[in-house]
Curated annotation (Swiss-Prot):
NCBIfam families: thrB. It comes from Streptococcus equi subsp. equi (strain 4047). Its EC number is 2.7.1.39. It comes from the Bacteria. This is Homoserine kinase. It catalyses: L-homoserine + ATP = O-phospho-L-homoserine + ADP + H(+). Catalyzes the ATP-dependent phosphorylation of L-homoserine to L-homoserine phosphate. It is found in: Cytoplasm. One of its GO terms (biological process) is threonine biosynthetic process.
């Protein structure tokens, strides 16, 4: 049995901590034979291969009596880059407990558990459901909408350095004034409405006019402004920080994808430039 969870790109500008899409990079976990102690085969560097791994910790949190197994974990989701690496592991851990513990969890229950562990639903929701998910957490309650995503292309630049979410949150203001909050939420409302109605030019303007986090975080990602300028000059709808960064996502018309890809490539930045697709399936068994 194999568990597969997609990478995610959260926020989409002003949808701070509440909106995200699933994209075509994946964490996969093969559930192999039972053994006396947990063991994870992987080639992912300094990640633990025993029961101190977040994957197994998450599973045991839900089902402490499930038998230990040998697991094989593979992933092309880069760590601490703003593509939901920790969320994918949490969601996979929940499904591991669900399968081995025969918990029969609904997707809604998986989302509630994942949100409680992660702290907000913007990554874990699209990791579970795929597509574009807009979610709200008030207390313990998590409400969400799985929404159609426009037909467009995604080009992502992944810098070769990590940016931990905790460090990225440290640059945010502790509070916004009432006037600032109203302005920021109006931009978010417009971005969502424009995405859902297919008005991608207005969606792009709203995404790039985020007032919640990107205006504070972009100075941590030196590649952001050069990529944003190059993408805009070649017809992109919007450029935004994926999650807490440092990954940078460009939304563009399908016919402009190659021109934008080449323009970013010509900047000579150090990192990985990839073309991504929307993942429509989310968490699944394969």
């Amino acid at each position: 049995m194999k568990i597969r969870v997609p990478a995610t790109s959260a926020n989409l500008g002003p949808g701070f901590d509440s909106m995200g899409i699933a994209v075509s990079k994946y964490l996969e976990v093969d559930i192999l034979e039972e053994r006396d102690q947990w063991f994870i085969e992987h080639d992912l560097g300094d990640i633990p291969n025993d029961d101190s791994n977040l994957l197994i910790q998450t599973a045991l949190r839900l089902a402490p009596n499930i038998p230990a197994h040998r697991l094989k974990m593979t992933s092309d989701i880069p760590l601490a880059r703003g593509l939901g690496s920790s969320s994918s592991v949490i969601v996979a851990g929940i499904e591991l407990a669900n399968q081995l513990g025969h918990l029969n969890l609904t997707d809604d229950r998986k989302l509630a558990i994942a949100t409680r562990i992660e702290g907000h639903p913007d990554n874990v929701a699209p990791a579970i459901f795929g597509q574009l998910v807009i979610a709200s957490q008030i207390g313990k309650d998590v409400d969400y909408i799985i929404a159609p995503f426009p037909d467009l292309s995604l080009v992502c630049f992944i810098p070769d350095y990590e940016l931990k979410t905790s460090d990225s949150r440290d640059v945010l203001p502790k509070q916004l004034s009432y006037k600032q909050a109203v302005a920021a939420s109006s931009v978010a409302n417009l971005a969502i409405a424009a995405l859902l109605t297919g008005n991608l030019k207005k969606a792009g303007r709203a995404i790039e006019n985020d007032q919640f986090h990107e205006i504070y975080r972009q100075r941590l990602v030196r590649e952001f402004q050069p990529i944003k300028r190059a993408a805009a000059a070649n017809g992109a709808y919007a450029t935004y920080l994926s999650g807490a960064g440092p990954a940078i996502m460009v939304m563009c018309p399908n016919k402009k994808k190659m021109a934008i890809y080449e323009a970013i490539e010509q900047l000579g930045l150090i990192g990985q430039l990839v073309s991504l697709e929307l993942d429509r399936q989310g968490l699944c068994l394969v």
